[in-house]
Amino acid sequence: MDECGLLILKIASARVEGHEMSLLPEEGELQQISARLLGVRIGMRRAANDFDRAPESIQLVCVSKNFPAATIRQALDAGQRVFGENRVQEAMAKWPELRQDFAGIELHLIGQLQSNKAAEAVATFDVIETVDRPKIASAIAAEIKAQRKAPKLLVQINTGAETQKAGILPGEADAFIGYCRNELGLDIAGLMCIPPVDQQASPHFALLARIAKQHGLAELSMGMSADYELAIQLGATHVRVGSAIFGSRS
């Protein structure tokens, strides 16, 4: 039986005289995180099945930004291996020891990257999801050559054209992706977006999917705790989920 089935049995066993009992308040933090992880995986599988997608084609990126290593260990103990961090320095402080203790970790940079942190980012992360401007792309290309280490790269698209948000504007995506590929020799694997918080996410997910299709890009990082099932419907290959697993951040 898989993890999702085990969670369903666990929930069923908590029913007493026809009433649902909450597991989370009665169990320790490890059990809470484990149950939440499985709950998200159930939701991902359900969404994939509902829209004729293979569940194994969609990866859960557990967003661990602002959470201490002790909390992350509980997700690792529960079997999660793919994580997302916003800041290079925070990742450098937390993850070397965790990598020593747990095999198979894949670490994604999901926050904006400063060019003076490109060397550390290439050294630290397996995936950089926020390639968002020529200066950063050039710095990453130089570090890939210098370090002989090539993290997977995704271009961040600012689908809402928000002035305060990072990302290439949709109308500039063609030229930027071409620059990354043809001028810098970067292997762009896919696209990433963060829709505006005050708008419906579906048009932004659909736009990202259209741009990816135009460029033959297979990977789409979109969808967070509140809308990952919708993102799966519209083609996400990676969903970035934090609060639904770890709870609210301090």
Predicted ranges, named:
Residues 9-20:
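Short, Lys/Arg-enriched N-terminal segments with co-localized hydrophobic residues
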